């Protein structure tokens, strides 16, 4: 038996994190998206040459429905603490306007809800942190309730309307992250 400390980040995701997510009721085909690249990388210009920087890629993004991300998860190998990826997860959650940032090393989860009470984030919204064992990851409905609070979808009609698909492409393309944020922002202002 290989020690958990010897496993790579990818192994931690496949052997510990994904099974914990699935056990909490998440549909692995429609609600879980792995290795999500959301920027192509910063462009650097030097003289007449250009070069792309490193693209930003989230380890896992959880969706309640298509185009409605409710959590971003950053994993680290087991030589790190469970919360070692939190700064990166928070950065991605802020960029993608996702209400929950999660970090894990395969021993458990550190979850930061960006809208409840406690510390204030860069966007002026409060942040609260919670630790969870592998067998106590939040369910889709729990994170959906949090999403509704984060986006101030206070009526049932507002919540239902936000679930209506606003984009469909037979080729499987989806809006870029900044387009999705703009669409949701317009929806939010129309519903409030």
Q: How should these model regions be labeled?
A:
Residues 1-71, 76-192:
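ATP-dependent helicase/translocase motor core
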């Amino acid at each position: 038996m290989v020690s958990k400390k010897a496993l790579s980040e990818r192994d931690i995701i496949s052997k510990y994190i994904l099974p914990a997510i699935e056990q909490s009721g998440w549909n692995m085909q429609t609600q879980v998206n792995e290795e999500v690249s959301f920027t192509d990388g910063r462009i650097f210009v030097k003289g007449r040459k250009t070069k792309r920087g490193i693209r930003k890629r989230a380890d896992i993004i959880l969706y309640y429905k298509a185009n409605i991300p409710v959590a971003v998860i950053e994993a680290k190998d087991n030589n790190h603490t469970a919360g070692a990826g939190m700064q990166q997860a928070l950065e991605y959650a802020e960029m993608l306007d996702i209400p929950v940032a999660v970090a894990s090393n395969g021993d458990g989860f550190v979850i930061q809800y960006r809208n409840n009470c406690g510390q204030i984030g860069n966007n002026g919204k409060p942040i609260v942190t919670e630790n969870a064992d592998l067998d106590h990851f939040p369910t889709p409905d729990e994170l959906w309730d949090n999403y509704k609070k984060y986006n101030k979808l206070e009526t049932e009609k507002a919540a239902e309307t936000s679930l209506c698909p606003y984009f469909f492409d037979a080729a499987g393309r989806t809006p870029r992250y900044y387009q999705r944020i703009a669409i949701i922002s317009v929806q939010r202002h129309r519903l409030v």
